[in-house]
Amino acid sequence: MYMSIFDLVHNIPIVTDYPTTELPAQSEPKETFAFIEQELLESLPALQKKESNNGNGLKQGQWTQGACAALLVRLYMNASWWIDEDKTVEAEKYCEKIIDGEYGFYDIDNRWDAPFDWDNDKSNELLFGYPSSFGGMHWLYDYEMFWQVAPFLSSKYFGFTDWGNCNPKYALQPGLDLNGNEYSFENGKPVRKFMKYPDDVRLKKYKNLGNSKREGMFLYGDLPYETANGTEYVTSDNGAYKLYIRDQVGIFRDTD
């Protein structure tokens, strides 16, 4: 929590006593950094190691030594931005400890999406996972992360309409201008960056394969789905035209 607020606001108060009658003053960034570092370093040896070589298992959602070490890595990697000090050596030190198994067995999964899957408690790539249960807080993650990042009627393409239509709010930053030329700025343009590696399996069009399996990570082009009348396509919210997703923003109806 402190690290997230520190990243967002930078000058934050440090509160170690509760209750208190005085409004705490803001702390200098270096003081906040040192406080977070001390908390993590003191907690690390007191936490449990990961015991399984088949994911976090029953420890899913519990802070372990590996997860704590990962927070230290994040802290040190951001030190140059947060306190204008280079902590790369410290970050590498704890990365090596995680890789070498000092805090339990961790490894890169053989599937890129395994750490994000519904059964990620079996993934050795996962350092920490926030637990959830259906009917609990899962709706917040589903709604903000998925239901707001897809076209209005794309639930038909997904093959899952139990929760109604999508409510699009976010989209990837386009990489091409109206004339089809790539923008000259370096940041963003995620699709253009992925296209530099055509063998990357994540570049495939997202498709629900059934049995809790899927492929790809992007939506682009036409979005077909099957009905009793044959193949149909996702349209605009009012059904006026067939939707065709491209790496541009503009009105392209009736164009190539």
Residue ranges and their predicted role:
Residues 106-256:
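Elongated scaffold/linker segments in the mid-to-C-terminal portions of large proteins
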Residues 1-159, 247-256:
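Structured, solvent-exposed acidic/aromatic patches
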